[in-house]
C-alpha cells in the first residue's frame, strides 16, 4: 500500500477511472473560463479550424484532476504540487469522449532538508479509441516515512 514517499518506486504506474465528457460540460466550462466560439457554440465551431465543438485545453487539464485524485497516487496524503512540466494538448477532446489517464513515476528526489520527497509523474490522458489527447508532468511533494533514511528506503539520489 502506498502511504509515503518511501513507498513509491521509479517506473510505478497508475491508471485512473474513466469518465465521459459531455457537450454540456464543455460549454459550461468554456462559458466561464475560455469563452471562444469553438468551445461554446456548436454551429459556430463547425466553421473554425476545429471543425466542431471541442473542449478547452484548460478544461481537459481540470478534467484530469479528479480522475488522478481517485487513484490516490500518494495514499492518504493530499496531492501538493510545486509545478508542472511538459504540458501538451495532443488531440482534440470532443463531446462524448470517454477519458482516462495513465501515469508513470519518472523521478523521485528525497529532500535533504525537509521530511518529504519530490515526485515527477508523467500523466497521459487517452480517449476511448486509445488516442493520447493530453499529457503533463506535475511535480508533487509527498511526506517521508517518519525516521527513515534514504539508505533504508532504497531511494537512490
Each model region followed by its residue ranges:
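Hot-dog-fold acyl-thioester-processing enzymes
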Residues: 1-82, 147-150, 157
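HotDog/MaoC-like acyl-thioester-processing domains
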Residues: 2-10, 89-152, 156-157
Amino acid at each position: 500500500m502506498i502511504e509515503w514517499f518511501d513507498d513509491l518506486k521509479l517506473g510505478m504506474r497508475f491508471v485512473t477511472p474513466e469518465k465521459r465528457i459531455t457537450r454540456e460540460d464543455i460549454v459550461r466550462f468554456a462559458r466561464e473560463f475560455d469563452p471562444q466560439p469553438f468551445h461554446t457554440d456548436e454551429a459556430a465551431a463547425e466553421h473554425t479550424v476545429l471543425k466542431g465543438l471541442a473542449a478547452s485545453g484548460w478544461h481537459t487539464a481540470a478534467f484530469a484532476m479528479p480522475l488522478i485524485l481517485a487513484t490516490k497516487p500518494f495514499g492518504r496524503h493530499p496531492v501538493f504540487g510545486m509545478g508542472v512540466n511538459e504540458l501538451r494538448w495532443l488531440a482534440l477532446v470532443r463531446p462524448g469522449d470517454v477519458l482516462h489517464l495513465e501515469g508513470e513515476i519518472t523521478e523521485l528526489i528525497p529532500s535533504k532538508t525537509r521530511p518529504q520527497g519530490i515526485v515527477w509523474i508523467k500523466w497521459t490522458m487517452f480517449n476511448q479509441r486509445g488516442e493520447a489527447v493530453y499529457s503533463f508532468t506535475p511535480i508533487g511533494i509527498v511526506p517521508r516515512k517518519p525516521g527513515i533514511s534514504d539508505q533504508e528506503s532504497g531511494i537512490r539520489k
